[in-house]
Amino acid sequence: MKATDLFDLKGNVALVTGASSGLGQQFVRALADNGAAVALVARRADRLEALKKEIEGKDCRAVAIEADVTDRNAMAHAFDAVEKAFGTVTILVNNAGIVQSPTRAFEVTPEEWHKVLGIDLDAVFYNAQEAARRMLAAGKRGSIINISSVLGFGVAKGTAAYAVAKAAVIQTTKALAVELAFKGVRVNAIAPGWFVTEINDKYLMSEAGAAIKRDIPMGRFGNEGDLDGALLLLASDAGAYITGATIVVDGGQVIQIKG
């Protein structure tokens, strides 16, 4: 089989959360460029509409849905809207997330803890659950891709809530994978390292960012397109026998032992 056929997503319907900016936008582009109909879900309607028009301008199918990923009713309606437009979601990319303020663990408030865990963990589980239920009911095979982080493997000061959530996403991925594999629904995760986005570009270009870059064996930060390979592998038939895995895309940062 040719590589172009192996990674072809024609006939698939993909839903991407956090699609209005950063990595989410790139995930939408990569999925659409390889044949999937895409549903863009986020809270910023104007950004979603602009991306939808961009995707449609390439003769790809897209629908924009304004929804809060922590609102289970809103997300159920989002899945309904996608089904009405394109059919059952067969690819879910659980990308929406937030970072915490740089607060030491003993200073994290209950409000911030619950906010970070609510978006970065709870929403991942419940939206995966919703997608899986619908795939099973429709008799569809599918792929759920959860976005974790290298902070799911190691921690840094001031990241307690975020690191806990991202580590739990990896275990959630494994738990769901074991229970859904028998029906042909694969569940995997991607753990990005430091990627330059509109949210963190000023920080990563600062002196502090330069120090982080020096600790990356490949000597650079990730670019948004650097995640396309992992995404398409897990979304397509190229990854048909992969489930419960977490692919680390970090330029070698996690494996390095500082001496």
Residue ranges and their predicted role:
Residues 128, 165, 173:
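Active-site helix of classical SDR
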Residues 149:
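Residue(s) in the substrate-gating loop at a strand-loop-helix junction
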Residues 87, 220-249, 254:
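C-terminal substrate-recognition "lid" of short-chain dehydrogenase/reductases
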